[in-house]
Each structure stands twice: as structure tokens, then as C-alpha cells.
């Protein structure tokens, strides 16, 4: 093997390595979990709450086109409540979504926020309602 052959093989190997990285990087980035934060606000109606949900990716950028459902329940009272699932809709700014739900009593609640698109992510947020 001449030095020239060796250089060609090295160059080919480096190119292959680099292009594999370029091809695989987006696939890995898409499977990284999303970060889901929320704030709850009271509306005029007793026990009704409006949620503002903020979804960001692993790089901290807002995630648009997310599909989000919120299911609330009381951890201390399994099977006792049946608040309908709430679907969140875009709230005007990238990565922000809003939804409303009405609780059935005051006390400790837990919300399961489930993102099904673009990356499956599930978070649970506990909160107190008075
Ligand atoms: Cu209850």
C-alpha cells in the first residue's frame, strides 16, 4: 500500500464518519424528551382552571405543532372523579398552549400532561385547588 492509497482510504473513512453523523444527528435530536412546564390560573368560575402549557425541546427552543392532552385526577381518591380530558390549543406564541378544565372539589389534584406529537412525553404536575 502506497502513501497515496493510505491517504485516500483515510479520507474516505473520515467522509463516511462525518456523513453518518449528519444523517443520525436529527434522528437523535427528535427522540430527546421535551420539557413541559405549566402555570394554572383561576377563571371567574369556582373550580375552573385555565392552564398555560409551555413546551420546549432539549435545546430550550419552543416546540410548535404539539398535540397535548391534560387529564386531572385526585391521587387520594382513585376512581372517584371523572373530569373529561382537556385538549390544549395553541396560545398565540410558539411553544405555548392553553386549555381549561373544571375540578369537582377542592383539594390535592394531579394533572397528567401528555404530549403525543412531535415527541411522546408525559409529565405529572401536582396542584392544590381551594
Ligand atoms: Cu375528590
Roles of regions detected by a PLM:
Residues 17-27:
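C-terminal segment of classical bacterial N-terminal signal peptides
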Residues 2-14, 20:
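Bacterial N-terminal signal peptides that target proteins for export
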Residues 28-130:
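Contiguous segments within soluble domain cores/interaction surfaces
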Residues 9-13, 27, 54:
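Intrinsically disordered, low-complexity segments enriched in polar/charged small residues
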Amino acid at each position: 500500500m502506497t502513501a497515496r492509497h493510505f491517504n485516500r482510504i483515510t479520507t474516505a473513512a473520515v467522509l463516511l464518519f462525518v456523513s453518518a453523523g449528519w444523517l443520525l444527528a436529527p434522528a437523535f435530536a427528535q427522540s430527546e424528551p421535551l420539557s413541559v412546564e405549566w402555570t394554572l390560573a383561576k377563571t371567574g368560575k369556582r373550580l375552573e382552571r385555565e392552564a398555560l402549557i409551555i413546551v420546549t425541546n432539549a435545546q430550550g427552543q419552543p416546540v410548535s405543532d404539539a398535540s397535548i392532552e391534560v387529564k386531572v385526577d385526585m391521587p387520594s381518591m382513585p376512581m372517584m372523579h371523572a373530569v373529561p380530558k382537556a385538549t390544549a390549543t395553541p396560545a398565540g406564541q410558539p411553544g405555548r398552549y392553553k386549555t381549561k378544565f373544571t375540578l369537582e372539589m377542592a383539594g390535592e389534584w394531579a394533572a397528567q400532561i401528555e404530549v403525543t406529537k412531535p415527541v411522546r412525553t408525559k409529565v405529572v404536575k401536582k396542584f392544590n385547588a381551594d
